[in-house]
Design a protein with these regions (language model features):
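Short amphipathic alpha-helix that is part of the acyltransferase structural core
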Residues: 1-36, 54
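Short alpha-helical
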Residues: 18, 71, 116-119
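A conserved beta-strand-loop-helix scaffold within acyl/acetyltransferase catalytic domains
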Residues: 39-80
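Conserved acetyl-CoA pyrophosphate-binding loop and the N-cap/start of the following alpha-helix
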Residues: 85-94
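Conserved active-site alpha-helix within GNAT-family acetyltransferase domains
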Residues: 92, 103-140
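Short helix-loop capping/hinge motifs at secondary-structure junctions, enriched
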Residues: 142-144
């Protein structure tokens, strides 16, 4: 699946077009992915619907991915734009493309986590979870 923007940027789910080194470098500096190894990153991409935002020349300028069963639940994560290109609407284009991806288009519950981009996601219907204390997490390192 591929979406195009007025200035010829595209978002694609073609994993063959991912510039893994660029994505890994960006995510290595992202607060939510610190310490994630190359192997873990590769497996996470392999086992999700990965979306790449590409410049008109085909250079990777953004990335995101869906983790979902395709029926009941979806988790949008690792949404990131090349730091040199932020503020140009590419994040908005990526999220718009992601929420319309056919793999999750009919999924009733789609979640994400953000520390600082609430206004971006609110444009597409995401809201703050009303009862966050109902959510729990399991971290492998804390249960060995």
């Amino acid at each position: 699946m591929e979406w195009s923007r007025f200035d010829n940027y595209v978002v694609t789910d073609d994993k063959a077009r991912i510039d893994f080194d660029r994505v890994f470098d960006w995510l290595s500096d992202a607060y939510w992915a610190l310490g994630r190894s190359r192997d873990v990153m590769a497996r996470s991409i392999e086992n999700s619907v990965a979306l790449s935002c590409l410049s008109p020349g085909g250079v990777q300028v953004g990335f995101s991915r869906w983790v979902s069963d395709g029926a009941t639940f979806g988790w949008l994560c690792d949404v990131i734009v090349d730091p040199a290109l932020r503020g140009r609407g590419l994040g908005t284009f990526m999220v718009e493309s992601a929420v319309h991806h056919p793999f999750v288009a009919e999924v009733p519950l789609r979640l994400l986590a953000t520390r600082d981009a609430h206004s971006l996601y609110e444009q597409f219907g995401f809201t703050v979870v009303p009862n966050p204390l109902r959510w729990m997490e399991f971290r492998q390192s804390s249960h060995q």
